[in-house]
Amino acid sequence: MLSRIVLLIAAVPFVSGCIVVANVNDPAWWDDSDEITRDISIDVDRVNFEARGTLYVVQGRSNRLRIQGHNQALQQIAVDDRSGALLISQETDDFRWWGVQRPGSEAVFYLELENLSSLRHSGHGEVKLGPLIVNTLSVISSGHATTNFSSLIARDLTIRATDHANVDIETLDSDSAELRVNDHADIFVQDINVLDVKLRAADHGDLRLAGTADTAFVSAQDHANIDAGALESAVVNLNTRNHAQVTTQAHELIEIDERDNSSVSWTGSALQQ
């Protein structure tokens, strides 16, 4: 009897008739951990991550996935690799403590890839990538996901964050990059070096970046915010709508289309058209 703890929730307005029984001495909950290693036979260059926990992605000479976690979490994880895509998913765990996920339900994933051209990340997990050197890369982060890049070099790059997702990039070098945020998501680039960049924000999205760009196309609407005040751009083409806010910097030429109670602030020596 002492090995079990019975908690009776008496606050009916919050939880009606709820009884939670937890055996804190059950080792399967706390210290029954294991590891799975899987060699990926196909040439994977696309990754879909829909599991709890953290995925680490590094570039290497082989395609290999290693997973560490409690046995119960490992049993919930499914890995499918076919047609050049790797899908990592996890069954929903309905057992929670007052809405908080039970300890041990998350795993740690270590993925080594020769090349990466597409990443789709959704859910409450976290993905940490880099350093990466690729030709083209498309990233979609959604559903409260957190996607972090250390160092990224890509000739052609597209990143989209939506539905409260967060994307953070330490250093980015690219010929052409497009960064898009909407639905309360945000993207933050600490240091970018790019020839041409497209910045698009809508529906309370937040986009911040610093660095250098030859040409910047900036579009914001529906209460979104773009802070490119620390981005040294030669040419800027800018349009704002519906209470959006934009801060930018231009040194040769700037064109502004500002409407619907939006706000634009810019610095530099550019000629305004």
Predicted regions and their residues:
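Short flexible/disordered coil segments
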Residues: 146-148, 155, 186-190
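A short, structured loop/turn motif at beta-sheet edges
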Residues: 82-84, 145, 221, 241
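Short, surface-exposed interaction patches in beta-rich subdomains
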Residues: 169-180, 184-273
